[in-house]
Structures are given as C-alpha cells and as structure tokens.
Amino acid sequence: TGQIAEGTLAYDYTVTFGAIKQGLLLYPGKAVGGIAVVAPLGAPWQKVLGDRDITVTIDSNLAEKLINYRIPMAHKGVNGNALIIGGSNDMIGAPILAAEAAVHSGAGKVTLGVPEVIKPVVQGRIIPEVMVTSTEAHKAMLEGRQVVAMGPGLGRTSDIPDFVDSILDSYEGPLVLDADALYALGHVGSVDKDALRDGEIESIYAVKQDLPYCVMTPHLGEFSRLIDLPIKWIERHYITLAREFAKAHQVILVLKGIPSIVALPDGTVYVNTIGNAGMGTGGMGDVLTGVIAGFI
C-alpha cells in the first residue's frame, strides 16, 4: 500500500526480490525506500504471481514503445477527427488547453464544442488549427467524430447532468471523461470498507450506475465522489480501488495522483514512475485530456 509504520527509517537502497513491490512505488513508502534494486528470485515473477492481476511500471522505454508514430504518407484525414466538449462562462481556458493539446498530440482534425454564449471569445483566443462549434446543436456536433473528450470547464449548473447524459446516449465511439463530466455522473459505485480493510477483493466494490466504455481521468477528489469514499481511504488502497473500479465498470481509469496510475478493464494496472512536482499546476489535467484524445 505504500503506508509506513511510525519510526520507519529512510534508506538509500532497497533490495527486493523477483519484481519491484507496489509499496516502493507509492508514497510515503517511495520516499523512504530510496533506489529499488530488483534481485533474482530463482523463477520468473509471472510464475510466482500465477493468475493474479499484475501491476506494471511505466518508464520512458515503455512509453516510447506505445507511441503511435505517423506513417510517411499520412494526412489530416487519416490522423483522426477529435471533438472536445467543455467551457462555461467562468471557465473558458480549460477547453482551449484541451483542444490545443489534442492538436499538438497528433489529431488530424480538432473541433471544440462550447456554449454559444462564449463561442466568440473562444474563437478569438484559440489557435487557428482548432474549429469552434456550438454545443446547442450537439447531435450535429457529434457526426463524424472518432473520439469525443468531455468535461474541461463544462461547469456544474443544474442542466449539465442532462447534457452529459445526452452526449453519452448519442455517441457510440471512444470517449474521454474528465472534470465536470465526471462530477455530473455523481456516485457510480460504492465501497465496502470492511471488505477493503480485510482484503476481501471480490466484495470490495459494487456498481450503482453503468458506464459506457471510456477513458476516465479523475484526480483523487473526483474519484472520491465517483465511489463515495473519503480520500484518506483511497490513499491507503490506491491501486486496489483503481483496479476494482476499472474491472467492475469495464473502463480505462487514469487516476491522477502521486503517482498517477492507469487501470485497465482486465485488471492490469500501470504505475507512472516519471511524473514530477512540476505537473502540479492549474490546467495540467485539461492538457492531459486533450493529449489522450489526440493519441486515441
């Protein structure tokens, strides 16, 4: 879990056998473990784990392998058509950041859907590569899109939950849900604290609301609302809760924290080992949403 006992000493190196342990990747354990050195166990770690769900570390080498490079004859028509939905009177910058990130991440065509009332302001501030449309005619807005990312700056007014539901009902392609789109969903599941405390994995999480297959990108506060559980509990059972959520809802969960992790529907969890404190600034999550949409 990464939790440490009172009085735990800090080390320069920790030798671990077979494979790196989760507690050395999660704070505060990572802060006292120093540099982790993996020593041979005498058998492949896959055999030791058997059929259990696995946790994988993301480093620069793995990230490079996963990047989908453009073919030499590529043009905008084959590089994807992305739609970003967001924005409100008080939050104009968030959807702009997301849309521009999608452009810089390789999407061939990017359209930003915002409320009609802020459309002129957005058009005057965004880079010219991004087309801007109104969310009022959202069915036409969705036509031809190969990925839709929704949430940055969307707002939390009373009409937003119905708007989010209408998009989810109307669009059948790849989805990225972030920020206020996640807030609009409310509590989608519940956690049995006793089962979590006792390690009864099969009984930990119960689904209250079905979700479409999508990528969800909550920070700890947003995840706390989704599963109706205090943040302090999430911090103690970080990987377990992310894994069970992704498996139960059959979604891809990008849980933003220290470290950020990616949980897949099959139970595999990827832990990011290369994040840094420089990411702790406003708008970083909006950019991530756009990057994910661009990669899709």
Regions of interest found by a model, annotated:
Residues 1-3:
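Proline/glycine-rich low-complexity loops and linkers
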Residues 11-14, 19-179, 183-215, 220-296:
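Small-residue (G/A/S/T)-rich helix-start motifs and N-terminal tracts that mark the onset
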Residues 7-9:
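A conserved, positively charged/aromatic
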